UniProtKB/Swiss-Prot annotation:
[2Fe-2S] cluster binds at C60, C133, C202. It comes from Chromohalobacter salexigens (strain ATCC BAA-138 / DSM 3043 / CIP 106854 / NCIMB 13768 / 1H11). Transmembrane segments: none annotated. Functions in the biosynthesis of branched-chain amino acids. Catalyzes the dehydration of (2R,3R)-2,3-dihydroxy-3-methylpentanoate (2,3-dihydroxy-3-methylvalerate) into 2-oxo-3-methylpentanoate (2-oxo-3-methylvalerate) and of (2R)-2,3-dihydroxy-3-methylbutanoate (2,3-dihydroxyisovalerate) into 2-oxo-3-methylbutanoate (2-oxoisovalerate), the penultimate precursor to L-isoleucine and L-valine, respectively. Binds 1 [2Fe-2S] cluster per subunit. This cluster acts as a Lewis acid cofactor. Its cofactor is [2Fe-2S] cluster; Mg(2+). Its EC number is 4.2.1.9. Homodimer. This is Dihydroxy-acid dehydratase. PROSITE patterns: ILVD_EDD_1 (PS00886), ILVD_EDD_2 (PS00887). Belongs to the IlvD/Edd family. Keywords: 2Fe-2S, Amino-acid biosynthesis, Branched-chain amino acid biosynthesis, Iron, Iron-sulfur, Lyase, Magnesium, Metal-binding. The lineage of its organism: Bacteria, Pseudomonadati, Pseudomonadota, Gammaproteobacteria, Oceanospirillales. Mg(2+) binds at D92, D134, K135, E453.
Amino acid sequence: MSQQDSPANADHRRRHSSIVVDGPGKAASRAMLRAVGFTDEDFKKPQVGIASTWSRVTPCNSHINVLADAASDGADAAGGKGVVFNTITISDGIANGTEGMKYSMASREIIADSIEAVSGCEGFDGVVAIGGCDKNMPGCMIGLARLNRPSIFVYGGTIQPGAGHTDLVSVFEAMGAYSQGNKSLIEVKQIEEVAIPGPGSCGGMYTANTMASAIEAMGMSLPNSSAQDAVSQSKKDDSRAAGEAVLKLLELDIKPSDIMTRKAFENAITVVIALGGSTNAVLHLIAMANTIGVELSLDDFTEIGKRVPVLADLRPSGHYLMSELVAIGGIQPMMKILLDAGLLHGDCLTVTGKTLAENLADVTPYPTGQEIIKPLEAPIKSSSHLRILYGNLAPEGAVAKITGKEGTRFTGRARVFNSEEEAQARINDLTVAAGDVVVIRYEGPKGGPGMREMLTPTSAIMGRGLGDKVALITDGRFSGGSHGFVVGHITPEAFVGGPIGLVEDGDEITIDAENDIMTLHIDDAEMARRRAAWKRPAPRYTRGTLAKYAKTVSSASKGAVTDLPEALDD
């Protein structure tokens, strides 16, 4: 009896696709698939969905169609049938500083939803997801975790440096310098024209490179996937190898839940800290852990951060770009250093089918004399740059990125703004001055909605030369390219009645990153008076994507996810 004649299928690798294409009752399904190139033999193979985030809206993703085809070819060569489909991407770099940036965090959920929906509908047995821009990585991973089918993530790769060692953040900071009168429009345009030379994700240890590195450390990417140039043969080879590797995962029945364990998340956090990675990793890793059923909290970043140093001299706080780290071996040699020091769990399973320790056993050390990754005995910072702060301004926590260059303590007078646009106008017209604590509120997950990145304001502050003289705190978040004395993810957010919504102009605020405390210097009676007088503002959106997002999204301290049971029960 042929496979089409019988729904019974002994091949455990086809437990999903067999339901869709096997047996006489599925003739219509097979007819549809024949029209997109399936043959009789293809119906007998495991189907591998290739989730591509290709788009021409951003250079981060403009090459991913080539990588998706390579992954599909790899799946075919290994005995499967690759099927490419697309999900969305937006561009944080284009949208930053505009209302459109409110869609950025929502896009993470849309990516996850669409990967889950297409793969669940089509009956893919395994999935390769390929991401480039910031929200692609966690969006893809949340989608893969929900499906819990044999899967691999492929990073689209990093961009090359622009002329003069420039990148996207160079442009934002040039704009800030222009507002201060320190650069001419001609100088800004000269940087604008060369900073982004072609495809690939933003070049520093910003959010995209941070999350790609975290996913590799977690074991959900092939070794070295996070550290390859976007336009390179090695990245095409990585994509093809991922397609092949999914067939091995199907054979061994290794699923994301077997890899994304508590120890694997601890490995990811360790590598993020060692690389000096983005604050957004806190938000995204907590969201990914929530999806796969692993308990992870803000305090885990504090505990791990006590024993893990910052080793990488990478932008935005350091000097080098990801392409330069690629040239000396990527993150694998650093992971071997961390493993040998007892800072990584070597027994974690990975998508190679081997443990992390087995993957790292024969890694070549960094070349002698390189200055990008510092030795453990002489780190850039002896403990984490990611600080989790509490206090009467952030009873449920806040996230700061403190390298030490900007100091570890700041006291100043509050300059309060109820939107990013309000703050940006006052920074640009030079109203904001040294000694100020810029407070940007009603920019949280629900209040914004969408938890916009404050890259434009922080870049303007840096461009004015005030990086160590002005602090910025917000219930929004920051780009991986933000640096300076900045604290974000303040919870509870203003829109739900958090204390940041009670701050008034002129209030004294202290940010103490040594003791991880953020204090609004008013007494309890005054706090109570203000709380009694506070009224929640009307929602900014009542229809559409952002209204739905605001209704279902959780607190930033829980990863700003949209499928927590308590949100869905409302």
